[in-house]
């Protein structure tokens, strides 16, 4: 028999350009607070590794590598870059952590025009960088990739290979589309180390991940937390939902009659992206042109990092591409909004 958890204790912390909030269902508020502070310290540590605004971060140092140089990196950077490359490959370049380099190349005042455009795309309307930015130490099949990740036992290394055709400034890595989700995954794992069995964590309400279930008190006035920004998720107490999990709103204000207005998260994550939050300047990394896929997208996956990256990719991909992707990944479901009143749900919502 499942015993409903005790009322949730809430804690918030600013990091990664947003506010992280933890709702912990634990009978001891002091213990829950200690666990939350441990999580926030871990998120701060991950930010120190990932932030492109910090010149000492591992991501900034990788972006400054010159051909032939390498950098010893931590397992977190290795894992996040590996996850980013996985999504890039699976979405055929719709998600790319090096898109900032492309943006700089397309700038009209760029004194160094691209010298490594993809063959067949040299027109000024459709320039782009090589899509095989990253090699995961798979040998000669990806030998042309400028950045290689190498793991030797417990040693992790990023290497920028020397390429005679590599353009200046090829690397300008930005983990903004996956880093917060990655931090949420690590946060949830740390809560498990503290034997916390019922918790929800969200990053600015754009990505959330949960374990266990919300307490009954989620339906009381004092415990309410709402967010109504369209492309963000809504952390919403809903006392009519009696199943196991944490009630989280989805779909924003878009009229989606065939889509759920809320889901129960437990053991998985939900992430949302959209033009109202990120603006109309989202580029399609495959073309360098403004994205024309969707105006809002949500993705739910067991990994918050993957959900975070996919919600960004689904903004770029067209509806048929999203449908095909979801059909190949049974652990995923997605909601995309093409235009007002035109919504599609793919995969089994859970």
Predicted features and spans:
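Mature catalytic core of soluble alpha/beta enzymes
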Residues: 1-350
